């Protein structure tokens, strides 16, 4: 066990702590308090009084609360480390001082020694002093056990090092790992910064349905559920795209939604079935303006949490300073493989050339566009360390994007790659309802033939397009991957508070 407590010892510890909770009750003290009035937080005190001299005391009334992370008792003195959300501070507890300030409680110091444990949540009042050894401390006058913990924290030597257990018991992970708390603070700062920027640019956020009658907006396998009263199947959304486009049809010219997406697919360091994305739509612009918006959103987020655009991710120096490199998918593949796929008109000839270049070609590869994408994913994607816009995708893999205005067979689409990973996807949105119907019907045929990720025909969406959708640029950014990048987190599970995990038999956590 990573936390060094056996199942039997855990039961013994729990039983002992239950007894301590009962002892508090017998003294008329509630081991699960209702409130505690707080005047300061630990980090504020550390920063405000960092210049306090050793041995100096400040006549400042302090009331704080937090979790006991460590405790040392030496005769008539005790030193606790208390952690609140902001940080830690030492509690300096003296027998005589507690006796003076807590006369209603017989032998308050001995009771403190007897009934408190690491993990308990404690409230204290007192003044502030720096000990002779230089530790800023709350010089405690009164205390109260606010929550009696029943289970022990992982010991300080081993910590919580089992990765699977860290994800499964995130609440313990957050208690003992300050860097994990910092990751989720930064995640909140990133989403707040993105929303602030869009708000200043005149965008509004509108929530669209999570439960949908049709699954569309991306090539992905949906989760299916059933509405009992209506007697109909429903799908958890795999994208917000089609509903946000309906809003553009309805007259919202700058609209976005930042929210959860659900895809019934595999789990990896980059994929979780439930994840967060932001989709942004702006009328009267194309994918060129969306590239500028992507640069603005990512750099705004980086500045908000790091204060710089030169970052390090997993040991790789990455410069987020715009403008970012732009290269077509055809050009990128040709640079890496020497093959100009735009010259091919025959699929079989192209497959032979790809195979000769070491590109794995699926037997059922249906088109030159799909083959180009296979070549890109295998030979190019992993090389794109610095932020790079890959532009102008094949129409065969982009059923919702507008045809390229000067390159037949391609669409006006880009994806942003950083550290070999896709971070954003964008189109000049397809607004021709006849072309859109044709493409969705082709997707539906693929679905009928067994492709579980192909699009359905969303008749209501097509009806909306027939009322007329203005020229529109659309953008999607994976928030989880952006947070990974800006917090130097190797796995998507590190940036999702409660990632999806396999079922675990009762008790196997220890």
UniProtKB/Swiss-Prot annotation:
Primary gene name: lysS
Pfam families: tRNA-synt_2 (PF00152), tRNA_anti-codon (PF01336)
Source taxon at top rank: Bacteria
EC number: 6.1.1.6
Primary localization: cytoplasm
Catalytic activity reported: tRNA(Lys) + L-lysine + ATP = L-lysyl-tRNA(Lys) + AMP + diphosphate
Enzyme class: ligase
Cofactor note: Binds 3 Mg(2+) ions per subunit.
Any GO BP annotation: lysyl-tRNA aminoacylation
Family of this protein: Belongs to the class-II aminoacyl-tRNA synthetase family.
Record protein name field: Lysine--tRNA ligase
Keywords associated with the record: Aminoacyl-tRNA synthetase, ATP-binding, Cytoplasm, Ligase, Magnesium, Metal-binding, Nucleotide-binding, Protein biosynthesis
């Amino acid at each position: 066990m990573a936390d060094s407590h056996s199942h039997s010892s855990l039961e013994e510890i729990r039983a002992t702590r239950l007894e301590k909770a009962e002892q508090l009750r017998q003294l008329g003290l509630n081991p699960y308090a209702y409130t505690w009035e707080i005047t300061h937080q630990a980090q504020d005190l550390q920063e405000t009084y960092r210049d306090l001299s050793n041995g100096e005391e400040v006549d400042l009334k302090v009331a704080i609360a937090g979790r006991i992370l460590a405790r040392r008792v030496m005769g008539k003195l005790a030193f606790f480390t208390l952690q609140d959300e902001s940080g830690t501070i030492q509690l300096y507890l003296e027998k005589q001082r507690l006796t003076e300030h807590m006369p209603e409680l017989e032998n308050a110091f001995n009771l403190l020694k007897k009934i408190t444990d690491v993990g308990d949540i404690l409230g204290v009042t007192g003044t502030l002093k720096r000990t002779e050894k230089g530790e800023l401390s709350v010089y405690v006058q009164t205390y109260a056990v606010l929550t009696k913990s029943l289970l022990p924290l992982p010991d300080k030597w081993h910590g919580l090092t089992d990765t699977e257990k860290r994800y499964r018991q995130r609440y313990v992970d957050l208690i003992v790992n300050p860097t994990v708390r910092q990751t989720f603070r930064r995640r909140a700062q990133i989403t707040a910064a993105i929303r602030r920027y869009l708000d200043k640019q005149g965008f509004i956020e509108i929530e669209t349905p999570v439960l949908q009658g049709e699954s569309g907006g991306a090539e992905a396998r949906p989760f299916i559920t059933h509405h009992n009263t209506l007697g109909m199947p429903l799908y958890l959304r795999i994208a917000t795209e089609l509903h946000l486009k309906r809003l553009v049809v309805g007259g919202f010219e700058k609209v976005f939604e930042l929210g959860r997406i659900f895809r019934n697919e595999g789990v990896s360091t980059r994929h979780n079935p439930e994840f967060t994305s932001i989709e942004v739509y702006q009328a009267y612009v194309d994918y060129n303006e969306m590239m500028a918006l992507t640069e603005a959103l990512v750099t705004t987020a980086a500045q908000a949490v790091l204060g710089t655009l030169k970052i390090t991710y997993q040991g790789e120096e990455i410069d987020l300073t715009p403008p970012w490199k732009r290269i077509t998918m055809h050009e990128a593949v040709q640079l890496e493989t020497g093959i100009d796929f735009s010259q091919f008109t025959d699929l079989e000839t192209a497959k032979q050339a790809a195979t000769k270049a070491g590109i794995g070609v699926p037997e059922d590869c249906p088109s030159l566009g799909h083959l180009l994408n296979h070549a890109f994913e295998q030979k190019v994607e992993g090389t794109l360390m610095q932020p790079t816009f890959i532009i102008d995708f094949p129409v065969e893999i982009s059923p919702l994007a507008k045809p390229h205005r000067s390159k037949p067979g391609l669409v006006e689409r880009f994806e942003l790659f950083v550290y070999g990973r896709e971070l954003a996807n964008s189109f000049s949105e397809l607004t021709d309802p006849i072309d859109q119907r044709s493409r969705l019907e082709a997707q539906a045929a693929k679905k009928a033939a067994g492709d579980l990720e192909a699009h359905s025909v969303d008749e209501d969406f097509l009806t909306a397009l027939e009322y007329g959708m203005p020229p529109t640029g659309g953008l999607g950014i994976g928030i989880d991957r952006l947070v990974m990048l800006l917090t130097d987190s190797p796995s998507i599970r590190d940036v999702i508070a409660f990632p999806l995990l396999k079922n675990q038999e009762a008790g196997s956590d220890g």
